[in-house]
Amino acid sequence: MMREAASLLVGLALAAGVAGCRVHVDKGVNGEEKSVQVDMPFGGVHVKTDQTTAADLGLPVYPGAQLITDNDHHKSADVHLGFGEWELRVKAVSYSTADSRDQVVAFYKKALSRYGDVITCQGNAPVGMPTQTSEGLTCEEGKNARVQVGSADYSTGKGNLELKAGSKRHQHIVGFENPKNGKTRFAMVALDLPAGLQGSSGKSD
């Protein structure tokens, strides 16, 4: 994803004849791209991997949970696109624990409550009450969204359990993946959408 994003923006800059385009790529010890930064006079995109923690998302780490570091995941991702007043920001990090999913769900329901009402979603449908937050966020919001950086997919899969809090524009999500090796796996996502983006409008932002 990072290489494609950088290539696209550089191509746009050259096609438009924009002066002052700057591209910076940091690589890891094995040559993998750890971050890509493309800056232009009218905006840019910054992508970082393996540098974000739960605290950066405004959430605590479940006690004893470990960052997922298998081949299917970066440990975390931080994606920022900004073009004038149009800005999109996604932060994501994945963890696993030997504790049960129910224990993790209970922990994050309490942790997410700092952002207001917490809704429980299964397959984009609400489970129990409330069915939407006081700021208008529902289980339908973001039903087609995926957070993927390279081979690392932070989506929790169709039909899996998610906890959500916030508004349509500013969301905090804890989603649960299928268990692996007897461990509960979950991803935390902080999502900030630009004003006017389809699905992000509403009385509250």
Where are the predicted features?
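An acidic-aromatic pocket/loop used at catalytic or ligand-binding sites
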Residues: 21-205
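Sec-dependent bacterial lipoprotein signal peptides
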Residues: 1-19
